[in-house]
Amino acid sequence: MDEGYGGMSNAELRRKVCHEPRRKHRERRATHHGPERSYQAFLSLPEGERARACEMDTVCGRPTDSQCLLTLMSRACRVQLPLLMPTKTKAATVARLDEVERAIGLDAFRRLSDPILTDNGCEFEDAGGIERSCTVPGERRCRVFCCDPMQSQQKGACERNHVEIRKMLPKGRGISFDDLDEVDAWFVGSNVNSEPRPSLMGLSPLAMLRAADPELADALARGLGICELPYDDLGLTLAAVNGERAGRGLAPLA
């Protein structure tokens, strides 16, 4: 019928003309990693290692923006770090993780981010660069594993937790991530990780982290500016971000 055979056209089919054309599924592109970094390899890790894994992803603003947020989320305590990146590229990802390692130290980086589970995005293609330490030559700072293609639910905790970031940097408001700076990222990270969660028995992710690993909590506060805020000072809104920017003499994001 689509080709016009039989002397009829789609216009003569009363119901078909009311339906939108079906979307074509994107073809799955080949993964950039071998079986040693596959999701099946991740599942073969001991249960304790999988439970404390770090899920890595990116949060983007407008399609035309260059900057984005690289997010690292600890499954164990739900702390999620939003790290500003100048571009969504594999080189920028490695460079940003290098900065984190230098800021908090190799041992703290390992406790926070080993192993890492991420997706098959182009920004995560340099698995070797992500894994190698930049402070101790020849050492490995983490192990990297990737979800199956188009199966982002395999790192669903990270995906769901992005909702908390979107409370402060919502979609559809004309926010350009190119206008963000490091202080904005720290402010968002401190607020999001200071919010009490029912799933953590009323504790915040940072409070849970401090109870489990106070040295790592101190390293994040000292090296990245991510620190727990008093409950009464929390502002999980875009207005709070704009208020903080106004205090620094900057224009609002939207």
What function would you assign to each model-found segment?
Residues M1-D178, V183-R197, A207-A254:
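Secondary-structure boundary/capping micro-motif
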